[in-house]
């Protein structure tokens, strides 16, 4: 099961390729994205000072202690260069349109694929609350703990929030979800 929610080196290479395509875009550029369930694991871009192994160990520890996928994704966003609205920030000032296939109940846009083009409602402080709630302070990789603590102190910028200018040029649309899938199955059955 963990291979479905943990990332690989191929994902890092692919994500680096995406980020390189987003360099030096202008207002006339349209960035079209498609996200779906599993997108969080497929877009691993460890933040500066972190390795993929750091992120994998953190994800595995969170899952092993019973953290929800929303909690795991909150931490992932703060250990990433692309999640939690950061893809939209990298693409800015280009116009970004994301189409999402949601496997998340309620279709929260900041949760689908860890919300790479949507404002992040979580914070470094919340991530540290999770670390303490699940008793992971002693077992997480040191660079992960250092990054989260630095974020709480304001030494590292937060993930972009709803007032960030990049979101004036970014939209996300759910084009498929569990309800639509069930309705289609009922119609064809």
Where are these regions (language model features)?
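Accessory alpha-helical/coil subdomains and C-terminal extensions
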Residues: 94-97, 119-189
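Structural motif
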Residues: 23, 29-34, 40-41, 67-70, ...
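Short, small-residue-biased leader/transition segments that mark boundaries at the very start
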Residues: 1-7
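Short, acidic/small-residue loops that bind anionic groups at enzyme active sites
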Residues: 48-73
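Active-site glycine-rich loop that binds ribose-phosphate moieties when present
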Residues: 13-20, 53-57, 80-85
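A glycine- and small-aliphatic-rich helix-loop capping segment at beta-alpha/alpha-beta transitions
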Residues: 23, 46-57, 89-93, 118, ...
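Hydrophobic alpha-helical hairpins/lids featuring a short glycine-rich hinge
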Residues: 8-49
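A glycine/threonine-rich phosphate-anchoring loop and its flanking beta-alpha core
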Residues: 63, 69-137, 144-149
């Amino acid at each position: 099961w963990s291979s479905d929610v943990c990332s690989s080196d191929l994902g890092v290479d692919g994500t680096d390729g995406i980020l390189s395509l987003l360099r030096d875009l202008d207002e006339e550029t349209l960035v079209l994205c498609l996200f779906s369930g599993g997108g969080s694991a497929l877009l691993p871009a460890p933040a500066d000072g972190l390795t993929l192994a750091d992120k994998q160990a953190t994800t595995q520890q969170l899952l092993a202690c019973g953290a929800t996928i929303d909690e795991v994704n909150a931490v992932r966003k703060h250990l990433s260069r692309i999640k939690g609205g950061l893809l939209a920030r990298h693409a800015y000032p280009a116009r970004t349109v994301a189409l999402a296939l949601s496997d998340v109940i309620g279709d929260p846009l900041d949760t689908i694929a860890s919300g790479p083009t949507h404002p992040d409602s979580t914070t470094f402080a919340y991530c540290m609350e999770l670390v303490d709630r699940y008793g992971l302070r002693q077992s997480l990789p040191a660079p992960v703990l250092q990054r989260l603590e630095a974020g709480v102190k304001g030494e590292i910028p937060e993930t972009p929030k709803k007032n960030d200018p990049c979101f004036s040029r970014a939209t996300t649309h759910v084009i498929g979800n569990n309800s639509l899938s069930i309705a289609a199955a009922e119609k064809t059955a």
